[in-house]
């Protein structure tokens, strides 16, 4: 949120770590799998959707799949935190805010449940939840699987199998959750997957005042930050900051 405004619609002005991630994803999009390991609330979902949307707009016959652990997280009428709603917002905005200017929009589009078509250039978005038959109907330039580590046990491997032959490029996006499951396997099994790390320590506001500890001994990483007198450091060996300690 921008300082001095209460609006929920703000410009997506990217930070340097987001710029780097955009370029890395775009470099290999459509070629091989991408694994995104992210901290919470760093815009990762908006990032891959925006990248897909750019290709949907400007690259002919670009077909994309988007998946989450339930159908309602992908598309549900009236629900504004679904993946498809975010794509609707990128195109048309909401309540007069956001969206593309009229001159930039495709002349012909089509929208139905779990589907969004650019009929000017033949590009499509198709949504799906975790079923064994997801995206069996045709090849995709890329398929994004959002919050993959949060998929129910079993569904995560079904999604992996269902998407294996549907695209050369699956984008596995998640905050890590334990040392088991399909997301963990994908990120830790040797392969040609392009791994992209989005860590809260790179955020210019949240990464202020970084510190850590070794065997209970404090180590200040951000030498320029002045901690308040009497600050209660947490000496658990993790990289921390006042943001993290809240």
Regions found by a protein language model. Give the residues of each.
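Phosphate/NTP-binding elements of NTP-utilizing enzymes
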Residues: 1-246
């Amino acid at each position: 949120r921008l300082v001095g405004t209460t609006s929920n619609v703000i410009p997506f002005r990217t930070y340097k770590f987001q710029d780097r991630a955009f370029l890395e994803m775009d470099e290999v999009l459509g070629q091989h799998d991408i694994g995104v390991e992210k901290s919470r609330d760093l815009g990762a979902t908006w990032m891959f959707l925006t990248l897909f949307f750019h290709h949907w707009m400007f690259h002919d016959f670009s077909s994309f799949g988007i998946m989450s652990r339930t159908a309602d997280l992908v598309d549900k009428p009236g629900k504004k935190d679904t993946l498809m709603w975010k794509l609707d917002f990128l195109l048309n905005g909401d309540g007069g805010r956001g969206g593309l200017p009229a001159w930039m929009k495709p002349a012909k589009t089509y929208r139905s449940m779990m589907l969004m078509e650019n009929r000017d250039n033949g590009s499509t978005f198709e949504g799906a939840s975790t079923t064994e038959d997801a995206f069996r109907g045709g090849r995709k330039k890329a398929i994004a699987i959002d919050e993959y580590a949060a998929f129910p046990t079993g569904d995560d491997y079904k999604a992996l199998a269902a998407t294996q032959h549907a695209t050369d490029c699956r984008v596995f996006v998640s905050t890590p959750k334990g040392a088991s499951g399909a997301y963990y396997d994908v990120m830790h099994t040797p392969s040609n997957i392009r791994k992209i790390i989005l860590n809260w320590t790179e955020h210019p506001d949240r990464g202020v005042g970084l510190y850590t500890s070794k065997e209970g001994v404090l180590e200040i990483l951000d030498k320029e930050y002045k901690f308040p007198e009497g600050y209660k450091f947490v000496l658990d060996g993790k990289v921390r900051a006042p943001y993290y300690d809240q």
